[in-house]
């Protein structure tokens, strides 16, 4: 299976996928991508913008995993903006999360995909497929194994 692992970090969930796949990982931080490459030497690692890479390459993969940055969606960040040390630094929630969900729902429906993010401080604009602990997941008609 050809897998696209976006915002890959040092690998996290990648260790659950086994070695029988052709994995392309995209990470913006070069230092972090080197750690990923060390842990998963068979994977192709791209240092770059995962959001843009998805837009340009989504149709080349059988399965896509995306875990976009959560900071602007998190309840902790929202609480800090209201009264914590970051007061008066309110930021818009990043809409890249919803851009990716819509892109994959409309243009990658025949293949498998999952987008993961924290449960936000607001009512989600698109209802998630399911939740686990503090995380929402939007997905194709794909069910994660209980091992996750």
Regions found by a protein language model. Name each.
Residues 1-148:
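Conserved active-site and SAM-binding loop architecture
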